[in-house]
Design a protein with these regions (language model features):
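Active-site-proximal helix/loop segments of hydrolytic enzymes
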Residues: 1-125
């Protein structure tokens, strides 16, 4: 669908989980995944923006060959916005006010990224 629609960017939003034997208490944070180099800047920027604006822990920014990061028509990233298996993060994930803040921060971050990465328009005069 991303290849067909050719959007300016593609962002897939998720909440993370761990295997049953994972460390639910000590694993937390926002993560971003990218595959093609054209998406690395977007992944790092939005990860850092959300961590800072929402005062959330960082899980990191990673290169990974995920289906939703492979399209080449646009910078395509996958964001993991927290760990559902972590009790404290689950409370944050399911809090309506936190969801609203997250949505606004994501929209603001995308807007700011576009502002910083706009291609100059050629002057044909």
């Amino acid at each position: 669908m991303i290849q067909k629609m050719e959007p300016a960017i593609a962002i897939s939003l998720h909440y993370n989980a761990l295997p049953d034997d994972g460390d639910a208490i000590n694993t937390q944070g926002v993560a971003a995944f990218w595959y093609h180099s054209q998406a690395q800047n977007l992944a790092a920027f939005l990860h850092d923006y959300l961590v800072k604006k929402l005062d959330r822990p960082s899980y990191g920014v990673f290169w990974n060959n995920l289906a939703l990061t492979r399209p080449t028509a646009a910078p395509s990233i996958l964001l993991e916005l927290g760990f559902m298996i972590n009790p404290l993060e689950f409370e944050w994930i399911t809090n309506p006010q936190a969801q609203q803040k997250l949505a606004l921060a994501l929209a603001d971050g995308i807007t700011e990224w576009f502002g910083q990465n706009r291609e100059p328009i050629a002057n044909n005069h």
